[in-house]
């Protein structure tokens, strides 16, 4: 793989199902040595994770990074809060968007870029139950149309 290309290590498919993603931001993650080894081995779960902004800093919360098998005493807590590396203007922009608007920050995927672990954070607004059903219905219709077009073109 060429330098600069992202190698996706984990995705949060549930986030796109549960939220409308308004905008996305790429952020670096502050990790310990054994954590980055676990991340490179794709032993990370984003399912229950979210990001929050406290005291002008962005933090990644509830993201599980499995302990590194050979790490023994140097392994950190798998559920610890990890700092996100964002520019000050990005943090203030996200903080302003989050104020009283029913929005949240959800991690969408973790990948390697130029050897560094990056997380794609989505500014998200929660979906209602009927929105989720509508999304599933639309996806099924598109799948059926593709199937019929494939069958039609095969003749």
Curated annotation (Swiss-Prot):
Its biological purpose is as follows:
Required for rescue of stalled ribosomes mediated by trans-translation. Binds to transfer-messenger RNA (tmRNA), required for stable association of tmRNA with ribosomes. tmRNA and SmpB together mimic tRNA shape, replacing the anticodon stem-loop with SmpB. tmRNA is encoded by the ssrA gene; the 2 termini fold to resemble tRNA(Ala) and it encodes a 'tag peptide', a short internal open reading frame. During trans-translation Ala-aminoacylated tmRNA acts like a tRNA, entering the A-site of stalled ribosomes, displacing the stalled mRNA.
Name where it's found: Cytoplasm
Subcellular location, principal: cytoplasm
HAMAP family reported for this sequence? SmpB
Statement: the UniProt record of this protein carries the keyword RNA-binding: yes
Checking InterPro entries in the record gives:
SmpB, SsrA-bd_prot, SsrA-bd_prot_CS
Give start-end positions of Basic and acidic residues composition bias.
135-147
NCBIfam families xrefs:
PRK05422.1 (NF003843), smpB (TIGR00086)
Q: Which domain of life is it from?
A: Bacteria
Region Disordered, as annotated, extends over 135-155
| Annotated GO CC locations | cytosol
Origin organism is Streptococcus pyogenes serotype M12 (strain MGAS2096)
Quick one: a GO biological-process term for this protein? trans-translation
Q: Keywords, A to Z? A: Cytoplasm, RNA-binding
Record-given protein name: SsrA-binding protein
* Family listed: Belongs to the SmpB family.
Q: Which residues form a coiled coil?
A: none
Keyword Cytoplasm attributed: yes
Gene Ontology terms, MF aspect = RNA binding
